[in-house]
Amino acid sequence: HDRSALWAEIQRCGVKTFGEPQADNFRWPLNRSEAKARLDEFITHVLPQFGNWQDAMHTEEPFLFHSLISFALNTKMLNPREVVAAAQQAWRLGHAPLPAVEGFIRQILGWREYVRGIYWSQMPGYRELNALDQHAPLPDWFWTGKTQMRCLAHAVGQSLTEAYAHHI
């Protein structure tokens, strides 16, 4: 996919970013058909193993058994209902085992949608909550990934280079 026009517009508008954004590293769908294709690819090729490997991480494989559909969900190119229905259909047709489908649906409904619902039901006051009474700024490594804690260096570094570091 040629993302050069989008990238030129981002640069022209002076969109502030952190990390290492690059036009050829922008792998997210730009329209519904691309988002649907990403979902279909996950359901067909990855979902059958999702139950066993949904929490796996590897320093050389940033995406592993993840669906890579969060961007499409967040930008409304996909909706959670159709994502769940696609996973259910894979199980009904015998293309994915129940533990994999259950694990994926739990990530969508039991985590993503639940947390999103709590967040928006409590806004705008939720933004100001500080239950731990924390006032210190985030450490520099949060923005650079430069820390001796290997797991955090990898997770933050991956976020900076891939704009991705989570399940969905």
Name every feature range the model reports, one short phrase each.
Residues 37-40, 44-167:
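Gly/Thr-rich phosphate-binding loop signature of adenosyl cofactor/nucleotide-binding cores
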